[in-house]
Amino acid sequence: MSAQKPGLHPRNRHQHRYDLAALCQTTPELTSFLIRTPAGEQSVDFANPQAVKALNKALLAHFYAVTHWDIPPGFLCPPVPGRADYIHHLADLLGETTGSIPAQATILDVGVGANCIYPLIGVHEYGWRFTGSEVSDAAMSSAQAIIQANTGLSRAIRLRRQKDPAAIFTGIIHKNEFYDATLCNPPFHDSAAAARAGSERKRRNLGQNKDDALNFGGQQQELWCEGGEVAFIKKMIAESQSFRRQVLWFTTLVSRGENLPPLYRALAEAGAVKVVKKEMAQGQKQSRFIAWTFMDDDQRRRFITRKR
């Protein structure tokens, strides 16, 4: 029986339960990580980090033509359906200005990560071109290896090292560059202790032992920063003012709804002309991203016309 997942974007390829037989045919290594649930249904052992990685590898190969994908131990292994939702809702946002989704959009992924997940999905689904920024040498090396291992990706995805860990756009967006949008999955904890506590909650929910590796992993720069998510996004908002004529839409995920009011205040103080919130849901998980622009309707249309 094929049950639809509530809340996913209509164009999301993961509307229904995973077809494990098809995924195992695409990626045979997934077969060794299948288990039976108490109800007798076949499933993936989500408490096993290697199983989650094998599932991601299969999903990317089966749906997005990514034939070679791997990440080093300890890095975030992102749930593909949720990441795809961000891309599809971003496409809708970009399409609102002209009435159609742009086929040649240029996107900046702030903190592309070892998994390179957003560019992989965006290139396949919409033919977009991506620049990915990264502060971690190890993450950048992993993302670069994925790009080089898959035919055609090097023409669509380029990576830039963020040499200043205190900067977000500065040093990445060059003087004469223009982007249709930026996207970001920001660090959400405000300390290493909070990140560990969050990992422990996930571990308990998955029924893992204390010594087990957490299935979604995460390096320091992926999980926490001083002041947490609100401080990081406020910094992004402040810095975005310097690039107000080079970027059409700045966007970022916001993990908690209660974080929105201080961010809205920061956007008003920064002079954002329009602010949009896109709600998303994957099963029981609620998420959202906010988008802001410093251009009015006419300026946005002119920006797109000039850029094309």
From Swiss-Prot:
In terms of Pfam families, this protein maps to:
Methyltransf_10 (PF05971)
Record-level GO cellular component terms: cytoplasm
Q: From what superkingdom does this record's organism come?
A: Bacteria
**Where is this protein found?**
Cytoplasm
E.C. number(s) listed in UniProt? 2.1.1.181
PANTHER family in the record, alphabetically?
RNA N6-ADENOSINE-METHYLTRANSFERASE METTL16, SAM-DEPENDENT METHYLTRANSFERASE
The protein depicted here goes by the name: Ribosomal RNA large subunit methyltransferase F
- Record the organism: Salmonella agona (strain SL483)
